[in-house]
Amino acid sequence: MNTIERALMHALFVHLHHNIDQAVDFKALEELNRKVSQQWPGALIVGPGDDAAVFQMPGIEGYLVAKQESHCSPCVPRPYDAAATGAGGAMRDVTAMGARAIFLLNFIGTRSLEKEVLVGPCGFVGKCTCGKCKVMTSQERLDLMVQGLRDMCAVMDVFVIGGGLSTSFTDIVPAVVVAVIGKLITKEPLTKPAKVAGDKIIIIGKTASDGNDTLFRAGLVPEMRPAVALFDEERTTLEASLAAFQTGRIHACSDLGAAGIGAAVCESARYGGFGAKVDLSAVPVKGEELTAEEILICETQARMVVQVSPADADEIMGAIESKNGIAAMIGEITSDDKEVFEYRGQTVATIPNKPSKEILESLKGGD
């Protein structure tokens, strides 16, 4: 297990599930689902395990899609971008199911508004040693977070229909939680799991070196660079994705969020019972020299991956490009039980669908 494999597997099998029981009251959720299923049998069409939930509401024709997401820690160094990318990420999750986002609700929890907070790379430790941080009031930071949410909604034509605020938080990290609701535009919901061995994997959008949290924790980069909000690119990716969906030829789809291409491909293949082979050299990147691990794992915004049969690939690429989207074929689904990532002809990471007990213990123990 090399360093890149360790970083990606830690993200897949440990970090993405870390402390989730403290963020989600599973007993309350189970009870709520039980009550809903009793009152509206069969209402939940796609539940936990995919990018968003798909459900039916009595008296409303068609399917609704909803996603709730928190984006808290990134608000310490970059409150504006973090709030905007939290909203944009939830919107992409809704889009990935074959829907167009319509409404957003939000909740923000922060310190008392008159309290001072340190915003920047050193915000977590409370003392600036980098010279890049700024001291501001909690009110000023709140204003930035609210503006980030509003600006993303404005670009994406999503209505903010409600929100909540608490100023009783004492932690350095504020809480930013958004819920996005949309309407399905495809005949049936799109889902994350891979469907057919041999399907081509197409990426929409360009990759950069921001959103490198996973790499930073693994010691593969010297500085954490939170994801940057990409407003116009988000809108372009939205319209390009919807154009691809309307061909009716998409087999699987996933938003690129935490751990980037690596997580999206590995989860899709694993959930479908397949493997995958990806050429990272084929990934469109922004004009900087990215390393293989940055292309694989960085969480650059405004990206999506879809899977299609080889015969339909050109049609899908054309649909994406008709909306000025950037698209590239980067790999294919295989009948294997692992995901193989190559860069310039060399294998840089091989991720098993079922890591051994020893590997999992090593990841959890940080050995």
Regions found by a protein language model. Give the residues of each.
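Glycine-rich phosphate/pyrophosphate-binding loop regions near the starts of catalytic domains
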Residues: N2, L16-R235, A243, A276-P284, ...
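Polyanion-binding loop/helix "lid" in catalytic or ligand-binding cores
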Residues: M224-A263
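Glycine-/charge-enriched secondary-structure boundary and capping motifs
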Residues: M1-A23, K27-A28, K132-K134, M152, ...
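Short Gly/charged-rich anion-binding patches and loops
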Residues: G89, G148, E239, A264, ...
